[in-house]
């Protein structure tokens, strides 16, 4: 499959031929569910002249439907481009294809979509991860050369790990959220899914930087990372031992072998522990659900999106539009968020979760003040079956090693390091200080090359 770096050197005619090839592949592999239905019927001329990049269905593209894979937004057409889309168009790239996702980015399986589930391209009985499962499946199966997703608690890194591609979440505020449908405003971050680390750096350089349209955008200097990539830096890496011990045997053995290879290649490895990751899960789901309950209050059937026809008055219209439009997982998180923000429980849950968040960030900072990067798992296991997770709590625990990175606002990247005996991918996660993406990408490139040359 052609890489993003190679495609950026294509002529206009070669780009057109590439788009035709990708469109044909998407139709042939429609069963994967990587793309939502309406994309397959679009005219190729609607995508622009640039190199094609697939876009998750919660990022605004002017004149394209924006549905967040939800029934409640069926028929809604975005009136403007997200800032990341504007940046793509300015750099000889163009949006090409709407990627499937968990409804409103709430999930770890890409099975809660209104359009139906996305399948793992390496084993169709397994989940591709979520919520950016469509983005990961598209890149991993050759239906896209690169893709944009969003990461609120691991939604770029975990599906990248399950599908075997690179998933990179920049530090909070490094990439504009203007035009991203909000789930949890203090945690959401647009990220990239690519075939390799160099492509991730190239695409990141295009979309990163300060944006005055986004009040949470970080107004700090940004320098492109791709031209300065250096795989030869011998970095000091902190391995989170207690997290590696919590993974299953396949993942644990692959990560331990990777650590040995890093040592053999001159990296200084130190071992650290972080607090019990189940505390991260509790804090994350309280904060994320609270913010989601506020953000999703705008979907009321009045201003945009789907309106219920079964109503005799305004109150009934609100209730029926939301009851009919939202899926089960979204309703569950709205109810949880409303509960923890209610007057009797705000101090008991929400305030305590915010204190835990500050503590988590402090612990990461203590380690990163002494080390260049952190090395830890992306997920406790390889991709699992669609029916293996029986309860919402089990699903929430699949994000156990990724959500703390969002709580701390740090950058993280998922890099493939091996496969199990069934051919399912295993990835390692590297984490950097806030806004030190250059070091993160240098380390990831080095890790990628070590794995290729083993």
Swiss-Prot record:
Coiled coil: none
Reactions performed catalytically: L-glutamyl-tRNA(Gln) + L-glutamine + ATP + H2O = L-glutaminyl-tRNA(Gln) + L-glutamate + ADP + phosphate + H(+)
EC number: 6.3.5.7
Any single Pfam family the record assigns to this protein: Amidase
UniProt GO cellular component terms: glutamyl-tRNA(Gln) amidotransferase complex
Enzyme class: ligase
Keyword Transport in record: no
Keywords attached to this entry: ATP-binding, Ligase, Nucleotide-binding, Protein biosynthesis
Record's signal peptide: none
Active site: 56, 131, 155
One BP term from GO: translation
Protein's UniProt keywords contain Membrane: no
SUPFAM superfamilies per UniProt: Amidase signature (AS) enzymes (SSF75304)
Top-level taxonomic group: Bacteria
MF terms in GO: ATP binding; glutaminyl-tRNA synthase (glutamine-hydrolyzing) activity
Family, per entry: Belongs to the amidase family. GatA subfamily.
Function according to Swiss-Prot or TrEMBL: Allows the formation of correctly charged Gln-tRNA(Gln) through the transamidation of misacylated Glu-tRNA(Gln) in organisms which lack glutaminyl-tRNA synthetase. The reaction takes place in the presence of glutamine and ATP through an activated gamma-phospho-Glu-tRNA(Gln).
HAMAP family referenced in this protein's UniProt entry, alphabetically: GatA
Subunit structure comment from the entry: Heterotrimer of A, B and C subunits.
Protein name: Glutamyl-tRNA(Gln) amidotransferase subunit A
Species this protein is from: Campylobacter lari (strain RM2100 / D67 / ATCC BAA-1060)
Gene from which this protein is expressed: gatA
């Amino acid at each position: 499959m052609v890489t993003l770096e190679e495609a950026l050197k294509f002529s206009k005619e070669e780009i057109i031929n590439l788009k035709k090839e990708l469109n044909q592949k998407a139709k042939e592999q429609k069963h994967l569910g990587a793309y939502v239905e309406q994309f397959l019927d679009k005219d190729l001329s609607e995508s622009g002249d640039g190199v094609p990049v697939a876009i998750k269905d919660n990022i605004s593209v002017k004149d394209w439907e924006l549905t967040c894979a939800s029934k409640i937004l069926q028929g809604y057409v975005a009136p403007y481009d997200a800032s990341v889309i504007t940046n793509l168009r300015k750099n000889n790239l163009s949006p090409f294809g709407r990627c499937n996702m968990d409804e409103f980015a709430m999930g770890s399986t890409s099975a809660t979509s209104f359009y139906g589930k996305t399948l793992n391209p390496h084993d169709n009985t397994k989940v591709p991860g979520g919520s950016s499962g469509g983005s990961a499946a598209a890149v991993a199966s050759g239906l896209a050369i690169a893709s944009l997703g969003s990461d609120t608690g691991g939604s770029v890194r975990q599906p990248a790990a399950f599908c075997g591609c690179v998933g990179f979440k920049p530090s909070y505020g490094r990439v504009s959220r203007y035009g991203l449908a909000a789930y949890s405003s203090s945690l959401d971050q647009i990220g990239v899914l690519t075939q390799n680390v160099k492509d991730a750096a190239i695409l990141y350089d295009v979309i990163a930087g300060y944006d005055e349209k986004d009040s949470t955008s970080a107004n700090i200097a940004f320098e492109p990372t791709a031209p300065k990539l250096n795989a030869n830096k011998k970095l000091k890496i902190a391995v989170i031992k207690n997290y590696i011990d919590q993974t299953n045997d396949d993942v644990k053995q692959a990560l331990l072998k990777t650590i040995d290879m890093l040592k053999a290649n001159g990296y200084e490895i130190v071992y650290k522990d972080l607090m019990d990751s189940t505390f991260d899960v509790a804090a994350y789901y309280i904060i994320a659900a609270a913010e989601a309950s506020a953000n999703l209050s705008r979907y009321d059937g009045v201003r945009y999106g789907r309106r219920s026809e079964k109503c005799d008055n305004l109150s009934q219209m609100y209730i029926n539009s939301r009851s009919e439009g939202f899926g089960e997982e979204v309703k569950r998180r709205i109810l949880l968020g409303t509960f923890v923000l209610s007057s009797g429980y705000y101090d008991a849950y929400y305030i305590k979760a915010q204190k835990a968040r500050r503590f988590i960030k402090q612990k990461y900072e203590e380690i990163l003040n002494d080390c260049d990067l952190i090395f830890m798992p992306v997920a406790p296991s390889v991709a699992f079956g669609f029916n293996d997770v029986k309860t919402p709590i089990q699903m929430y625990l699949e994000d156990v090693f990724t959500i703390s990175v969002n709580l701390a606002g740090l950058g993280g990247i998922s890099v493939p390091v091996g496969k199990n005996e069934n051919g399912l991918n295993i990835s390692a996660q590297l984490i950097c200080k806030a806004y030190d993406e250059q070091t993160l990408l240098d380390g990831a490139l080095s890790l990628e090359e070590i794995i290729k040359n083993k």
